Amino acid sequence: STRKNDTHALLYLDLDQFKIINDTCGHGAGDELLRQVTALLHSKLRARDTLARLGGDEFGVVLEHCPQNEAMQVANSLRELVQNFRFQWLDKTFTIGVSIGLYSIRQDNEGLAHVMSAADSACYTAKNEGRNRVHIYQANDNELQKKSSGMEWLSRIQQAIADKRLCLYFQPIIALSNKNELE
C-alpha cells in the first residue's frame, strides 16, 4: 500500500458444487466450467483488480484501493453473478454457487501468509454457514476451521476403528540402568 491508511481487500472464492460436475461429467467439463467462470468473474472486475486461480476450484481476487464496505458489495455482486450463471455441458444444465471469504488488507497486516490464511478461513466459514454466501473475516474464524478439522479427523479415526483398519503395536520401555521393564 503506497498511501497511509489505504485499504485493499482479498476475496477468497470457492465454487460450490464443482466436485459434483467434475465427478459426474469428467475433467473436461470441470475445466470448461473453470474457463467460463474465470471469464464471468473477470468481466465484472475493475482493470486494477487481480483475479487468480489458487488451485482446484478456488480463486483469489485482490481489490486494490477498496474499503471493506465496497469490497462487500463487489463480493456480493460476484456471488450473485455465479449464482445466476447456468453451465451447459452436453445435455445437462448445472447451477453452481460460490462461497466467498473477505479479508481487508491494511498496511499493518502480518504478511502474505497471514492474509491468505485469514481469507481462506473466512471462505471456510462461509461454506460452513450454508454455502453461496460472503463472510467477512473474524478473528475466531481460524478457531472454527481448526475445530472442524479436528472433528473431521475424529470422525475418520472412529470410522477406522469401527472398520477394524487399525492395529496396535507397542514397544516395552526398559530402563538402561538395570535392563528391567518399566511399569
Regions found by a protein language model. Name each.
Residues 2-9, 16-46, 52-64, 68-76, ...:
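Conserved long alpha-helical elements within nucleotide-processing catalytic cores of c-di-GMP signaling
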Residues 125-170:
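C-di-GMP signaling machinery
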